[in-house]
UniProtKB/Swiss-Prot annotation:
Name used for this protein in its record: Cyclin-D1-binding protein 1
Keyword list, A-Z: Acetylation, Cell cycle, Cytoplasm, Nucleus, Phosphoprotein
Keyword Ion transport (UniProt): no
Entry PTM: Phosphorylated.
Entry keyword Aminoacyl-tRNA synthetase: no
Protein's gene: Ccndbp1
């Protein structure tokens, strides 16, 4: 009599299952970055969306905690236990992504980017947690595991902090831009104050001029690449004024959006944020270009790029609903100030262009 045996499905070892899950989660990231909304605006329910997204995020956080705890206990989890928790983590992560896909673009590109970035942080954070569990010795929870688990929890908790409309999202992004440009402006001012190579030397004893011309050049910079020449210092003045104008422009734009921005004007708010986002990187490029050794042609190029972005940002703001008074003079004044700075920079860098 032939005996029948029930086939037993083969399960990979626990660590191999974790490695496979980490790969699966990372394969989802490109899909999230380019994914389109799956619902029309008519089907979108704002309150239901935020509730669903937050609940899905909290589920991922809970599963991440269970996963970390399971691999911190003795004995180590069986292949069956590992399969079960891996499936739960995968399902929870897919639910977060599915919730994101229900957020339509016409609710605001700025807000949608914030939601997308939050989801990416959750998915990537979970994959990093799996990496940490794979790297740690079996049955020996390391600080890295706990940190990774906490990072997942923090990413999940941040979902509740996401602005709930595009105006609030725009203000958040503009505030970040203002802060970044403020930091760059203060850094540049501090560099100008502290990088005078002759500070405290020429003023100490004018009569003892020979002390500044000894054989070793004691007290004087020996490398001209480490300090500003007189020509550099003259060029820095309009560059600093241009950075100052950038900071003032962003602050003014943020104030206008805060005071006059309308939640239903999502496209105009997105346009303002998009162009304003370009200001900080352009400021950074200019600030970096004025550090010694200074290439005057590079300063001219980075200045022109910043001026182009600034004027475009001011013009887009002026043409939008956040500027209810066409006769408001501050935008033309800022544009004139920016143009004046650029004219001066062109004048001071003309020799570099002609070489």
């Amino acid at each position: 009599m032939a005996s029948s045996t029930t086939p037993v499905s083969f399960l990979a070892p626990p660590l191999e299952q974790l490695r496979h899950l980490a790969e699966e989660l990372r394969s989802l990231l490109p899909r999230v970055r380019v994914g389109e909304a799956q619902e029309t605006a008519e089907e979108f329910n704002r309150e239901m969306f935020w509730r669903r997204l937050n609940e899905a995020a909290m589920k991922v956080s809970g599963e991440a905690t269970v996963l970390t705890t399971l691999f911190s206990k003795i004995p180590s989890p069986s292949p069956q236990e590992t399969q079960r928790i891996c499936e739960q983590v995968h399902i929870a992560t897919e639910e977060v992504i599915a919730a994101y896909y229900t957020f339509p673009k016409d609710q605001g590109i700025t807000l949608r980017k914030l939601v997308r970035n939050a989801v990416l942080d959750i998915v990537d954070g979970t994959a990093q947690l799996l990496d940490a569990l794979l790297a740690a010795p079996s049955q020996s929870p390391e600080n890295g595991d706990l940190i990774s688990c906490n990072s997942v929890s923090v990413a999940c908790q941040q979902v509740a902090e996401i602005p709930k409309d595009n105006k609030a999202a725009a203000l958040l992004m503009l505030t970040k831009s203002v802060d970044l440009v403020k930091d760059a402006h203060e850094e540049m001012e501090q560099a100008v104050e502290e990088c005078d190579p002759y500070c405290g030397l020429l003023d100490d004893s004018e009569d003892n001029s020979d002390s500044h011309h000894n054989e070793d050049g004691v007290g004087l910079p020996s490398n001209r690449d480490s300090y500003w020449s007189e020509e550099d210092q003259a060029l820095i003045t309009p560059c600093l004024a241009l950075v100052r104008a950038s900071r003032a422009s962003l602050k003014k734009i943020r104030i206008l959006v805060a005071e006059n921005g309308r939640k239903d004007q999502v496209a105009q708010l997105d346009d303002i944020v998009d162009i304003s986002d370009e200001i900080s990187p352009s400021v950074d490029d200019l600030v970096l270009s004025v550090y010694p050794p200074v290439c005057h042609l590079t300063v001219r190029i980075t200045s022109a790029k910043l001026v182009s972005v600034l004027i475009k940002a001011l013009e887009i703001t002026k043409a939008s609903h956040v500027s209810p008074q066409p006769g408001d003079s501050w935008i033309p004044l800022l544009i004139n100030a920016v143009d004046h700075c650029m004219d001066r920079i062109k004048e001071l860098t003309q020799r570099a262009v002609e070489l």
